Amino acid sequence: MAEIEGRLHVSRKDWKGCTELKKQDIKEKNMQGMIYGIGVGPGNPELMTLKAARLLREADAIAIPGKEKETCTAYQIALGAVPEIEEKEIIPVVFPMTKDEAVLKESHEAAVKSLAALMDQGKTVAFLTLGDVTVYSTYGYVHKKLLALGYESVLINGVPSFCAAAAKLGISLGEKAEPIHILPGSYPVKDGLKLSGTKILMKSGKKIADVKRELLLTECPAWMVENCGMEGERLIRSAADIPEDAGYYSLIIAKDREEQ
């Protein structure tokens, strides 16, 4: 007996050896739906994985992080790779941009309730996320809650935005024993830039002026990519040229200062 992507697969020989109670347990487990948290990549539909595309085609419903599919970036990326999803059931899941723990908890619980209801109907759901589902993805909270309730939730990797950004810039993120640090926008900028190796500053839009100032003070090599793989993409190759009006989808890569 083996479990493959949330389903129990039993050989004929093993099935004959199962008790009636065990057979019923297997049937009930396989009747329940499941959910995939799918990373659609950073922006270009061509960067979405073959596995992600296959699972989107097979899914009964598509859950999107937003109110409408027309304005949901993750959905538009997936649509570019798999046009067939336009005919599927769309489930809007809204996560407010706030640090209020009570509001966040309420939105997570509402998301879990709506997704669980679909799985209770035996449906397979694909939840879309930008970049990679394991890197600062809101789905992570929902994933843990669904697992705790006994539902099958599987994470499907996508190309991380910082890997795509480095490729766009034509630079390496790590060489030899060089460490790589991934820092959220909420991390103290000054402390982060003191770390040795490559520093990847995610979602720094609101603090971009502070980040730029610290980068200029440290005189370390820095790059910025805005809207990687999307419309309005910008590549910046020095700290001095980083715009202070950079948008939400802005990512900065900083290296150690080169010794003269």
Predicted regions and their residues:
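Class I S-adenosyl-L-methionine
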Residues: E28-P45, L50-A53, R57-Y151, A240-P243, ...
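Structural signal for conserved beta-strand scaffold positions within catalytic alpha/beta enzyme cores
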Residues: I64, I91-V94, L155, E175, ...
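Extreme N-terminal basic, low-complexity initiation segments
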Residues: M1-V10, D132
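Short gly/pro/ser/thr-enriched loop/turn and capping motifs at secondary-structure boundaries
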Residues: K69-T71, T98, P160-C163, M230-G232
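A contiguous loop/helix-start segment that scaffolds small-molecule binding in enzyme catalytic cores
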Residues: I35, L193-Q260
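Class I SAM-dependent methyltransferase SAM-binding "motif I" and its flanking Rossmann-like core
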Residues: T134-L195, P243, R257
